Curated annotation (Swiss-Prot):
Highest classification ranks of the organism: Archaea, Thermoproteota, Thermoprotei, Sulfolobales, Sulfolobaceae
S-S bonds: none
Function: Catalyzes the hydrolysis of glutamine to glutamate and ammonia as part of the biosynthesis of pyridoxal 5'-phosphate. The resulting ammonia molecule is channeled to the active site of PdxS.
Name recorded for this polypeptide: Pyridoxal 5'-phosphate synthase subunit PdxT
Quaternary data: In the presence of PdxS, forms a dodecamer of heterodimers. Only shows activity in the heterodimer.
Length: 200
């Protein structure tokens, strides 16, 4: 199994280490590769779009010609996990808590609506315990950094975990979106769930 991680910015290293742990836990012989240009998408079984700044990631991906290719592969069934800014990239509708609608480049493959900076600047980062029973796991302490929120889901998109009634983990077919940073968590639960998604 070969997993690609979009490597423009964001926590590539942390996702790499968390994936390695998940591979070990599930006894999977896995390979992890950085993805920057279209040819890097060749022969991968799944892809992770990490956190960072979603507008920057989108603009760089567009400039390097990978944005449309990613969208095509994801809509054709390539398993993807987007975390924080990565979840924003996957959403069909994006607005900002302060400035309203945005016109940033998006993959836009998932039937969710996201509000950027949902918790406000005063809550730059915080930790919270969420219930992962819908993915067959227990409670987990997770990290939110300038986090967005999934405020609406439609079609086949479904909420897998909430915080105070707001969706923080969602799935639609081959797509997994988290508004928190699972790579900074003590548990590999989210990465393990993603690998199950990849295995099919």
């Amino acid at each position: 199994m070969k997993i690609g991680i979009i490597a423009y910015q964001g926590s590539f290293e942390e996702h790499y280490l968390q994936l390695k742990r998940a591979f070990d836990k599930l006894s999977i012989n896995g390979e992890i590769t950085p993805v920057k240009i279209p040819k890097d998408l060749k022969d991968i079984d799944g892809v992770i779009i990490p956190g960072g700044e979603s507008t920057t990631i989108g603009l760089v991906a567009k400039r390097l010609g990978i944005l449309d290719e990613l969208k095509e592969k994801i809509t054709s069934g390539l398993p993807v996990m987007g975390t924080c800014a990565g979840a924003i990239m996957l959403a069909k509708e994006v607005s900002d808590a302060k400035v309203g609608k945005t016109s940033q480049p998006l993959i836009g493959a998932m039937n969710i609506s996201i509000i950027r900076n949902y918790y406000g600047r005063q809550r730059e980062s915080f930790e919270a315990i969420i219930d992962l029973s819908k993915i067959g796991k227990g409670k987990a302490n997770v990290v939110f950094i300038r986090a967005p929120a999934i405020t609406k889901l439609w079609g086949k998109a479904q909420s897998l975990a909430e915080l105070n009634g707001v969706t923080v983990l969602a799935e639609e077919n081959n797509i997994l979106a988290t508004t928190f940073h699972p790579e900074l968590s003590d548990t590999t639960s989210i990465h393990e769930y993603f690998l199950h998604l990849v295995k099919g």
